[in-house]
């Protein structure tokens, strides 16, 4: 459905796009600075001013290249096989695509309760595909991105406080419920056991226990009553419950 609905002077709908036409000459290049916010147009403007204050494409291209080289340079491998290097650093790059920052430069973010919240002194993250990532990607982050792991756990705790459950598959501040298990738990435990960050361990533990005891979540009530449910689900819950 690509039909936009106008409500409160805003266009809403599925697959709605914005189109801009510029009166350019042949081979003319134009420079357009854009920014986004999960909160407001004002937030997007603040993000743009903070992150791209100058109209200098080449400067930001050079900074972006330097940032990626610094990120990928956190792990150095030695090999005479160029294909091995390409495969390794491509995989390392892929590991850095998500999670994504979901708070504005002023700390404001849109929570799962559809309210605007404030992250003071930390960065709110989203895009947690936890069934896919708790086994390898998140343990990797504890070595390559420990300061981000701290903020990720704080994001989990905030999500629990606003949603009543730790995230399962958090995407842009909302719960998609596309996966089984509640794999935020092993991510939290791994960070705690490695002594990472200053997140509130008591709040984190309370969130883990409360999530594990939600009878109405995907068979947990039967799991608690019988000690088992279909084996493929039990296999995933064991990672959280042991």
What residue ranges belong to the model's regions?
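Acidic/polar, glycine-enriched structural segments that form the non-catalytic walls/loops
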Residues: 1-124, 158, 165-168, 198, ...
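Aromatic-rich carbohydrate-recognition surfaces in CAZymes
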Residues: 126-242
């Amino acid at each position: 459905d690509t039909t936009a609905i106008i409500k409160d002077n805003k266009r809403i709908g599925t697959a709605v796009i914005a189109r801009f036409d510029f009166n350019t000459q042949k081979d003319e290049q134009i420079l357009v600075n854009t920014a986004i916010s999960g909160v407001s147009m004002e937030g997007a403007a603040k993000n743009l001013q903070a992150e791209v204050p100058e109209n200098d494409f080449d400067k930001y291209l050079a900074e972006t290249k330097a940032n990626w080289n610094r990120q990928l340079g956190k792990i150095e491998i030695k090999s005479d096989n160029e294909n091995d290097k390409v495969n390794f650093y491509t995989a390392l790059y892929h590991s850095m695509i998500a999670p994504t920052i979901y708070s504005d430069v002023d700390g404001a973010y849109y929570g799962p309760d559809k309210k605007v919240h404030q992250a003071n002194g930390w960065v709110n993250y989203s895009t947690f595909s936890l069934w896919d990532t708790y086994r390898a990607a998140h343990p990797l982050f504890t070595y390559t991105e420990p300061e981000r792991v701290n903020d990720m756990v704080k994001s989990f705790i905030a999500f629990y406080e606003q949603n009543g459950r730790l995230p399962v598959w958090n995407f842009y501040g909302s719960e998609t419920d596309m996966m089984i298990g509640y794999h935020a738990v092993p991510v939290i435990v791994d960070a705690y056991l490695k002594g990472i960050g200053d997140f509130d361990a008591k709040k984190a533990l309370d969130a883990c226990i409360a999530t594990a005891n939600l009878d109405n979540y995907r068979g947990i009530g039967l799991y608690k009553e019988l000690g088992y449910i279909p084996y493929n689900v039990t296999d995933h819950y064991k990672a959280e419950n042991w």
